[in-house]
């Protein structure tokens, strides 16, 4: 069952986190510019329900939740809920008649991927992380084509390494020469995600105060929802108002990346890919509770290239953080070289590569 009109159509499945949604949006925008009709499959409770319509794409919802780590009752009920969600996805596919289905992670990808194959529609998978999620591990066995961002991601199936699709404006930023002006102050961008990172919020005020005694440092700190007053108050208590900007959430990450000399952050797949494409040095603190510790493996891509320092959270303290920042503040040549080494592993054409695979398979359907 395929679309009988001349207009090519793609159903994209991605949701739950920005690490799934934003790469998928990059592909959606690329194909939309090529004249494709794009539709989304997600869940009503997750971030895709808000983000996808904001970017001008229609979205359908199915009723599905994750089961890993949940109670016995939910696990026993899970097979019946999955069957229902597969049926819901098949209804969407029958109505939309896509030429190809692209799964990029999130709860909807599992039922949607199965529904695509049952409907005879080519299924393309893209895995953003260095360790695949459970859904993509399962779907990789029935997919028409498996794509991934990093080498050695899949053991059991052959996957093409294409990188992670990132926003056009960030790719352009990576092609723009850094300001060669005076660099008296080390500009540190601190990003802990939309909810912030407690470890960054706890440590950075003291780190900044101690660093300021011997080095010039300026901080732009995203503290996360609900943390603004407490973290800002601590910076103020330490007399750092003039050298620190504190925000609950940074809307313009392009501006933040352009401003920064170094980034202190988690090592989600999209973040790692953005840092590499732009060529930004980083201090990476993997989220210690990530499934299968995949953020540590993501980080290794930049660490092995020499573009980042790895700082595991269980051993992270004020002294270790100050030590790394002092190295970068004192040796600007090393800072610049770290940026170049990060850029050496960046992939800037991932969006086109993913889109090209979808176009090719749609032509065969």
Curated annotation (Swiss-Prot):
Its main location: membrane. The keyword Glycosyltransferase applies. InterPro entries: GlcNAc_MurG, Glyco_trans_28_C, GlycoTrans_28_N. SUPFAM superfamilies: UDP-Glycosyltransferase/glycogen phosphorylase. Pathway: Cell wall biogenesis; peptidoglycan biosynthesis. It catalyses: di-trans,octa-cis-undecaprenyl diphospho-N-acetyl-alpha-D-muramoyl-L-alanyl-D-glutamyl-meso-2,6-diaminopimeloyl-D-alanyl-D-alanine + UDP-N-acetyl-alpha-D-glucosamine = di-trans,octa-cis-undecaprenyl diphospho-[N-acetyl-alpha-D-glucosaminyl-(1->4)]-N-acetyl-alpha-D-muramoyl-L-alanyl-D-glutamyl-meso-2,6-diaminopimeloyl-D-alanyl-D-alanine + UDP + H(+). One of its GO terms (biological process) is cell wall organization. It is a peripheral membrane protein. Its EC number is 2.4.1.227. One of its GO terms (molecular function) is undecaprenyldiphospho-muramoylpentapeptide beta-N-acetylglucosaminyltransferase activity. It is an enzyme of class 2 (transferase). One of its GO terms (cellular component) is plasma membrane. NCBIfam families: murG. Cell wall formation. Catalyzes the transfer of a GlcNAc subunit on undecaprenyl-pyrophosphoryl-MurNAc-pentapeptide (lipid intermediate I) to form undecaprenyl-pyrophosphoryl-MurNAc-(pentapeptide)GlcNAc (lipid intermediate II). Belongs to the glycosyltransferase 28 family. MurG subfamily. This is UDP-N-acetylglucosamine--N-acetylmuramyl-(pentapeptide) pyrophosphoryl-undecaprenol N-acetylglucosamine transferase. It comes from Shewanella woodyi (strain ATCC 51908 / MS32). The lineage of its organism: Bacteria, Pseudomonadati, Pseudomonadota, Gammaproteobacteria, Alteromonadales.
């Amino acid at each position: 069952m395929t679309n009988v009109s001349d207009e090519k159509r793609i159903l994209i499945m991605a949701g739950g986190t920005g690490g799934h949604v934003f790469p998928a949006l990059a592909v959606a925008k690329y194909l939309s510019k090529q004249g494709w009709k794009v539709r989304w499959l997600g869940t009503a409770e997750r971030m895709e329900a808000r983000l996808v319509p904001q970017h001008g794409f229609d979205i359908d919802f199915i009723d599905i939740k994750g089961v890993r780590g949940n109670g016995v009752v939910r696990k026993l009920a899970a097979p019946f809920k999955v069957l229902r969600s597969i049926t819901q996805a098949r209804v969407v596919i029958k109505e939309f008649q896509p030429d190809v289905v692209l799964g990029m992670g999130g709860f909807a990808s599992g039922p949607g991927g199965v529904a695509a194959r049952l409907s005879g529609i080519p299924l393309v998978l893209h895995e953003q992380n260095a360790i695949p999620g459970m859904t993509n591990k399962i779907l990789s066995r029935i997919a028409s084509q498996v794509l991934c961002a990093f080498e050695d991601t899949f053991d059991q199936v052959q996957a093409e390494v294409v990188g992670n699709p990132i926003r056009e404006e960030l790719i352009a930023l990576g092609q723009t020469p850094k300001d060669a002006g005076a660099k008296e102050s080390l500009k540190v961008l601190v990003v802990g995600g939309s909810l912030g990172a407690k470890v960054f919020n706890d440590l950075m005020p003291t780190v900044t105060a101690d660093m300021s005694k011997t080095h010039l440092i300026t901080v732009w700190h995203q503290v996360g929802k609900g943390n603004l007053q407490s973290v800002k108050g601590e910076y103020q208590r330490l007399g750092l108002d003039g050298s620190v900007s504190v925000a609950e959430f940074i809307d313009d990450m392009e501006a933040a990346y352009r401003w920064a000399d170094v980034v202190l952050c988690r090592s989600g797949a999209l973040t790692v890919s953005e840092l590499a494409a732009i060529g930004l040095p980083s201090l990476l603190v993997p989220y210690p509770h990530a499934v299968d510790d995949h953020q540590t493996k993501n980080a290794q891509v930049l660490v092995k290239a020499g573009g980042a320092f790895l700082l595991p959270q269980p051993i992270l303290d004020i002294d270790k953080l100050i030590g790394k920042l002092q190295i970068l503040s004192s040796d600007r040549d090393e800072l610049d070289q770290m940026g170049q080494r990060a850029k050496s592993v960046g992939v800037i054409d991932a969006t086109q590569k993913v889109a090209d695979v979808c176009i090719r398979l749609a032509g065969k359907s």
